Design a protein with these regions (language model features):
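C-terminal target-recognition/interaction regions appended to catalytic cores
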Residues: 40-172
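Flexible, glycine-/basic-rich loop-and-beta segments that form/coincide
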Residues: 1-48, 70, 90
Length: 172
């Protein structure tokens, strides 16, 4: 979404920190073991991150605990899940998000699915790889909704403040 009007001054409002959603709200209590990183992949990610730290590069995996917030999910998440890894209590190695968790992270909750007639949430009709790609390429619906509301609000105020010459007069 993009809107521009040269004589309207707009800045995004600061986020309401009381509404921050942590990972624990989307995590499954007993995810299938196939989402746990193998010893080989976990060692590879650690070694790769160390190599890049020594070179001064920014590569690293995102190791999250359930009380934190997730990093951005990308379409490449299906490859190794390194952007968003979840610390484990019972297992030594971290795990990736399940497709169901990724769906909820990106805002496609069961309540959202009901708006489209899916009473039990959106069914997964593609492979895990395709699901991760689709979620990683999507935009969070709530983000789009909030941006659109801000644009409508500012434009409505600008129209209300229109001066007699027909030009939009901003009082910002």
């Amino acid at each position: 979404i993009f809107g521009e009007e040269s004589d309207i001054n707009f800045e995004f409002p600061e986020p309401d920190k009381s509404k921050i959603i942590t990972l624990k709200t989307i995590l499954s209590s007993n995810p299938p073991k196939k989402y746990m990183l193998s010893d080989k992949l976990w060692k590879y990610l650690q070694d790769y991150a160390q190599k890049h730290r020594e070179k001064g590069n920014g590569f690293g995996f995102g190791l999250n605990n359930e009380d934190g917030v997730a990093r951005t999910m990308s379409a490449r998440y299906h490859k190794d899940g390194s952007e968003i890894l979840i610390k484990q209590k019972r297992w030594r190695n971290p795990r990736r998000l399940t497709p169901h968790e990724a769906k909820h992270l990106m805002g496609y909750t069961d309540d959202y699915a009901k708006l489209f007639g899916h009473q039990d949430g959106f069914p997964q009709v593609v492979s895990d790889t395709q699901a991760y790609r689709q979620f990683g390429n999507s935009v969070v619906p709530k983000v789009v909704e909030d941006i659109a509301q801000q644009i409508v609000s500012v434009m409505a105020e600008a129209i209300t403040n229109k001066n007699s010459s027909g030009l939009i007069k901003s009082k910002f």
